[in-house]
Amino acid sequence: YGMSVITAIVAENTYRVSGIMDVSPDMIDKQIRDVYEDIYPDAVKIGMLNTIETMTAVAESLKIWQPQNVVIDPVMYAKNGSPLMSLDAIETLIKVVVPLATLVTPNIPEAEEIAGMMISNIGDMKVAAMNIHEMGCQAVLIKGGHAKGDATDVFYDGHKFYQLTTSRIQTKN
């Protein structure tokens, strides 16, 4: 079963983000606890964590419940480029959240922010994946949808790289 924990409510469309309302850390904790007490998940996928307080609440819950598989998709920007994560939270993401991940799945702009480097080609994606892996996660998948040409994702597990390439599908969303 798919179960959700809401960390923020975002009002947005394809042109802009008009508002973000954070859910309190206490409410995040209650949601996570209620999920785990009912149906223990086989995997956890984490998306938008936009504040230090939200990241801390989620990280503490992960330490308590110790899920086997944790996928972190560090949602930092909306499709239109609007920021969804406060700049002061990026360090907390790197030091507190990323080390708890089985897999981190940033897109290119997010990988640039986390790895602290520009990405302009597949080689750069590999270097960024290694840099992010060194932050403590088990594996990294950099999503190449923001690059030009075919969409190529780069997966790195600490030992080997895999490239996954397909034709780009143009969408507004």
Where are these regions (language model features)?
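Structural motif
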Residues: Y1-S4, D42-A43, Q68-V70, P83, ...
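Short glycine-enriched, charge-decorated loop/helix-capping segments at active-site entrances
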Residues: R16-D22, S82-L87, G116-S120
